[in-house]
Amino acid sequence: MRLPYMSPAILFVIGASGAGKTAAVHALGQLQLTGVGCYHFDSIGVPSAQVMEQEWGGGERWQEQMTTRWIERLVANPDWVEIAVLEGQTRPSFIEPSIRRLGVRRSRILLLDCQPAIRSARLAGPRAQPELSNERMDAWAAYLRGQADALELPVLDSTSRSIAEVADLLREQVDVLRGSAGAAA
């Protein structure tokens, strides 16, 4: 009988729409790495802006609460993983208080970014969500880049990389977390 890992290390892959988060984390999951679980923030469902405003007081508040819920779920470790990889659009400032409060000892936050023209092409093309290619998304991407720079978070530019290449680079981040297991014990 396999015993569950107490609390997994968590790799947060954040970024704006079209940066390649979902595709890369899906590809990472396809590698079926031992002890690694891949999770998608939006799989919980994303309510309309109106519902976010009515029930949470706005999108920012919804994002903060859902980030906390995700971290609580991952810490509970229902899938018995050693490393949980969560991709989504959230602020590092929402991640850090929850990981401290919940006692997450091993985590990394990685920004997946790309040039605006590439993001726009991805959203209009394969994603078929051209409505997300706008000034607001560009501002969100710039905000996340600024936060990553200010907090000295690693940034992975997916502009000229294939999904498989980005997944390989994410695997390297998983290996870094796996290697830190002995240091945290």
Regions found by a protein language model. Name each.
Residues R2-P8:
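Phosphate-binding P-loop
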Residues V13:
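Hydrophobic anchor at the beta1->P-loop junction of P-loop NTPases
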Residues V25-E72:
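Conserved substrate/cofactor phosphate-moiety recognition/catalytic segment
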Residues W62-R106:
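Glycine-rich phosphate-binding loop used to anchor ATP phosphates in small-molecule kinases
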Residues S17:
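The conserved Walker
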Residues G88, V104-G125:
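Conserved phosphate-donor/acceptor-positioning beta-strand/loop module used by diverse small-molecule
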Residues T22:
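Walker A/P-loop
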Residues Q129-L169:
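Small-molecule kinase domains that catalyze NTP-dependent phosphoryl transfer to phosphate-bearing small molecules
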